[in-house]
Design a protein with these regions (language model features):
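Electrostatic, structured charged patches in enzyme active sites and in nucleic-acid/phosphate-binding
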Residues: 1-100
């Protein structure tokens, strides 16, 4: 099982606002010790590329994907922020010890 939150971006919020949302997720992690993935889904790969710059270096694991990559959210479309690894399935972003 993969535990995650998904943020569906419609391109209406500033990139700074997207980054600010991670503060609440970090507070959840600090209060509970539970560290789910936070997945941002973007309307375009261009918006995804821009957002990845402000979503880096956070306390919570963040991954991004975008429309137009072929397979949709269930496919090999997710990029872990802060990693140089290629796009992967969501399940492949979870360390093996955290899978259930």
């Amino acid at each position: 099982m993969v535990e995650f939150f998904i943020e569906v971006d419609r391109g209406t919020e500033t990139l700074a606002r997207l980054a600010d949302k991670l503060t609440g997720y970090a507070e959840l992690v600090n209060a509970t010790g539970w560290t789910p993935l936070v997945c941002f889904w973007f309307p375009t790969t261009g918006r995804e590329t821009e957002a990845r710059q402000v979503l880096a270096h956070r306390e919570v694991p963040v991954t991004t994907g975008a429309n137009g990559l072929g397979d949709g959210p269930g496919g090999v479309v997710w990029l872990q922020v802060g990693s140089t690894a290629p796009r992967r399935h969501l399940i492949d972003l979870v360390p093996a010890g955290r899978r259930s």
